[in-house]
Amino acid sequence: MKQSINIQDQFLNQLRKENTFVTLYLLNGFQLRGLIKGFDNFTVLLETEGKQQLIYKHAISTFMPQKNVAIELE
């Protein structure tokens, strides 16, 4: 049986590995900018100007990277 592809994890992992600057839009419209330093099933660790923020995924609306991210869809 073929493994299902987890696009979210691939996307976040590429952002983390490539140190891609990203803008996070929260559900309340607030924007956070920085680098993804880590993530798990429920949270994303964002670093901005040397300070870390742990954001719950259920509060995030959109990830907008500064450049396109290459991920494997097959």
From Swiss-Prot:
Checking Pfam families in the record gives: Hfq
| Superkingdom assignment | Bacteria
Q: Which GO terms describe its cellular component?
A: cytosol
Which UniProt keywords are present, listed alphabetically? RNA-binding, Stress response
Membrane-traversing stretches: none
- Record's PROSITE patterns? SM (PS52002)
Q: Which GO terms describe its molecular function?
A: RNA binding
Signal sequence region: none
Spell out the InterPro entries in the cross-references: Hfq, LSM_dom_sf, Sm
Coiled-coil ranges per UniProt: none
Cite the CDD domains for this sequence. Hfq
Q: What are the recorded Gene Ontology BP terms?
A: regulation of DNA-templated transcription; regulation of RNA stability; regulation of translation, ncRNA-mediated
* Domain spans labelled Sm: 9-69
Quaternary structure note: Homohexamer.
| Function noted in UniProt | RNA chaperone that binds small regulatory RNA (sRNAs) and mRNAs to facilitate mRNA translational regulation in response to envelope stress, environmental stress and changes in metabolite concentrations. Also binds with high specificity to tRNAs.
Belongs to which family? Belongs to the Hfq family.
Protein's name according to its UniProt entry: RNA-binding protein Hfq
Q: What is the lineage of its organism?
A: Bacteria, Bacillati, Bacillota, Bacilli, Bacillales
